[in-house]
Amino acid sequence: MDVLFIHQNFPGQFRHLAAHLAADPKHRVVAICQPHAPRHPKVPNTFVYQPARKPRPGTHHYLHGMEDGVLNGQAVARVLLKLKKQGFAPDIVIAHPGWGEALYVKDVFPATRLLSFFEFFYHSDGADANFDPEYPLSFDGRARIRTRNALHLLNLTACDAGISPTHWQKSLHPAEFHSKISVIHEGIDTRAVAPNPRQTFTLPNGKILTFQDEVVTYVARNLEPYRGFHQFMRAAEEICRRRSKTEFVIVGGDDVSYGQRPSDGQTYREKLLQEVRIDPKRLHFLGRIPYERYLALLQVSSAHVYLTVPFVLSWSMLEAMSAGCLVIGSDTTPVREVLEHGKNGLLVDFFSPKHIADAIEEAFSHESRVQLVRRAARQTVIESYQLEIGLSRYQKIIESLVASQVEMTARETAAIDQ
């Protein structure tokens, strides 16, 4: 089977799936991505695309994302046409269409099955936007969100089938497309991400943390309100007042992945450090760190705080559970799909730093009960989010799509012969 992956940041969500398919000699795996993408060592046949230009400044700002998507789609189509000219015709294309790259796949390869990864469908109410009253949504923002979904609607109509990683993320898409979308989480490697009570973690100041220390961890791609960074810092201030030995270890960059940047040019980290009073000797900002070091941090964590507005569920929460962390998660819809309060984690009010701090303190005060919750957290990932489960489900839908195309081609050929 010839498989083509399209993802601007390949491998992205397809890291494990691409490796799994590439390991089978029956498959030829090819990928298309942007030049900055990390790529995958097991997929050497990776081609890059480069949009001809950026969206024009004169384009209406509601349509910048759409124009960007069209430019990306055109650039990918040029690569596809070259591959087609060289004789390559994929049996299936697996794409993250969020940036427009898959818009014209069917125009180049009409018979090829297109499996698209549907991560999010935007709403001005009921999801991320307008959730946090500290960051209200303007009418202009509402209109921009409605327009932004035009690209996603094109993607939904173009694909043969879709994947969403959680039931909640699927539910955000228009009901008329639900029959197209299967829920398959890409999966967590539970063998690699596992508890290790003998692990140590050395801080930049030379202090060595172990599983016996009071260690509160927080991880995000970037430190920003979408992932509750402001509420975490306020809760950390409260814990710092209550307990003298707690260390706070924070992983994440100073950029903004989602939402708006601060209007004054500061980072959210700078703004929160001006607001809260925390002993700087116990507050450790690590920035972005290598994956192995991140896993070691999870393994010494006493309480892992994961806060998010209703948005895409982070891999880091499931990885923390797989590592045996006590996860203190916001009582928001994507988190509730996985965490059951008191059973495999603790749910807290996103808007209450005191409630978050109380849950952190519970992690230090009820060791025997917390151990049961930790074990249940890992078991949840093993039973429902383990890598092998995701790969198996992906394999089934891929085989089904390709088989349906083969069957359709056979019927068409038979009709011609008659």
What is each model feature region?
Residues 53-63, 112-150, 191-196, 200-202, ...:
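Acceptor-binding helix/loop patch of EC 2.4 sugar-transfer enzymes
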Residues 309:
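Aromatic "clamp/platform" in nucleotide-sugar-dependent glycosyltransferases that forms part
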Residues 168, 187:
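Carbohydrate-associated surface elements
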Residues 256, 261-288, 292:
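Nucleotide-activated donor-binding/catalytic signature segment of Leloir-type glycosyltransferases, i.e.
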Residues 362, 369-384, 390-396:
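A short, well-ordered alpha-helix in the C-terminal region of glycosyltransferases
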Residues 202-227, 233-238, 248-249:
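Conserved donor-binding/catalytic core segment of Leloir-type glycosyltransferases
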Residues 341-342, 346-353, 362-367:
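Conserved acidic donor-binding segment of nucleotide-sugar-dependent glycosyltransferases
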